Amino acid sequence: EKYPKRCNALILRGIFLCRPQEIEWFLYGMRTVFPDHWEVFAGHLPPQERCDLLTNYYRRLIDPDPNVHMPAALAWSRYEGACSTLLSDSKIAEEFQRKELALGLARIEAHYFVNQIFLPEDALLKNVDRVRSIPGIIVQRR
């Protein structure tokens, strides 16, 4: 949105605007669709820390000790991978358990969530007129 003249076209996939309600859905709401995966995700934290999954996961993810951050990263990434498709996919599950992917994915997502993607709330939607003339396609899968 900041430099629309530098963009010829948009191909969008997995649209997530990082609004508070979307973060809430990721952290808590998806338990209505994937209760088993959510239980494992939330169960990584002690019961007294489950009321604020983001803060407590983030604290672990930024801990310099691999014995602290890697289990949290793997739990976060496993949850993300398991909930990214409607039906279980062993290849996706395996990919999301790669340590390199898990740590980067979990840290980046949690960092952006904690910082509201470094933008004022709804900034992307409020400024959509800036990119309205750019051709685009949304690729979405089940």
Regions found by a protein language model. Give the residues of each.
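Active-site nucleophile elbow and catalytic-triad environment of alpha/beta-hydrolase enzymes
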Residues: 111-128
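Secondary-structure capping and boundary motifs in well-ordered enzyme cores
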Residues: 98-105, 129-130
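Generic recognition of stable, solvent-exposed alpha-helical segments in well-folded globular domains
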Residues: 52, 71, 104, 123-126
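A catalytic-pocket lid/entrance helix-loop region that shapes and gates access to the active site
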Residues: 2-58
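Short beta-strand/loop motif that positions the catalytic acidic residue
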Residues: 131-132, 137-140
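Short, hydrophobic/amphipathic alpha-helical patches that form generic packing surfaces
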Residues: 75-85, 103-114
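Generic, well-ordered alpha-helical scaffold segments in large soluble proteins
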Residues: 2, 6, 112, 130-131
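Accessory cap/linker subdomain of secreted extracellular hydrolases
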Residues: 55-96
